[in-house]
């Protein structure tokens, strides 16, 4: 390999779709809007006569729609498997987005090998987040990967994952969260 290509990694269409899905989930949480609405806006803008944004890949749309539909289950399972010293809500938004994309792929997309979902998530986190993000994202997803069949079964059964303590999506205005001083929180 030539010297100029050392360190160069090829990234296929799915990697780019995952990365765009992370961008959109991050934006949705930051702006407090529905990520599916962002997809719709991007599709409209990309279909204009003089497009101002790149077209949305089908796989990006599948990820966003899947995460939006399964968000409560995904967040419940992530909360169960994240390190005891962390709360999902307290992680940086970009890390939550990366974890949600990878979790959706692991549980709901049998076409993606679990190892691929984990490796790609760690790589995206290393590009977008802090130096330490890759390690705890890898640990969380490896923990989930070790029992992926059980988790897929739980995810397929709506009653198998507790929904009562599930965090409300930032774009879901149907429920009001308690004020910060009213919320019970025993972990950092």
Swiss-Prot record:
CC per GO annotation: cytosol
Keywords: RNA-binding, Transcription, Transcription antitermination, Transcription regulation
Composition-biased stretches (Acidic residues): 172-188
Keyword ATP-binding: no
A GO biological process held by the record: DNA-templated transcription termination
Any single Pfam family the record assigns to this protein: NusB
GO molecular function: RNA binding
Region (Disordered): 154-188
Keyword flag Manganese: no
Family to which the UniProt record says this protein belongs: Belongs to the NusB family.
Function, in words: Involved in transcription antitermination. Required for transcription of ribosomal RNA (rRNA) genes. Binds specifically to the boxA antiterminator sequence of the ribosomal RNA (rrn) operons.
NCBIfam families, sorted: nusB
Protein's name in the database: Transcription antitermination protein NusB
Species assigned in the record: Corynebacterium efficiens (strain DSM 44549 / YS-314 / AJ 12310 / JCM 11189 / NBRC 100395)
């Amino acid at each position: 390999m030539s010297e100029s290509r050392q360190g160069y990694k090829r990234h296929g269409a799915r990697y780019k779709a995952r990365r765009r899905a992370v961008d959109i989930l991050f934006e949705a949480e930051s702006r407090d809007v529905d990520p599916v609405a962002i997809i719709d806006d991007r599709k409209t803008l990309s279909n204009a006569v003089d497009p101002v944004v790149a077209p949305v890949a089908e796989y990006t749309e599948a990820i966003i729609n899947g995460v939006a539909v399964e968000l409560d289950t995904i967040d419940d399972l992530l909360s169960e498997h994240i390190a005891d010293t962390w709360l999902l809500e307290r992680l940086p938004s970009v890390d939550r987005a990366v974890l949600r994309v990878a979790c959706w792929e692991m549980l709901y997309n049998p076409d993606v090998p679990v190892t691929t979902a984990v490796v790609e998530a760690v790589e995206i986190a290393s590009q977008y987040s802090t130096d330490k993000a890759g390690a705890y994202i890898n640990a969380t997803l490896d923990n989930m990967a070790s029992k992926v069949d059980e988790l897929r079964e739980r995810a397929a059964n709506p009653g198998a994952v507790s929904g009562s303590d599930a965090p409300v999506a930032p774009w879901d205005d149907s429920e009001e969260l308690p004020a910060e001083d009213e919320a019970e929180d025993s972990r950092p």
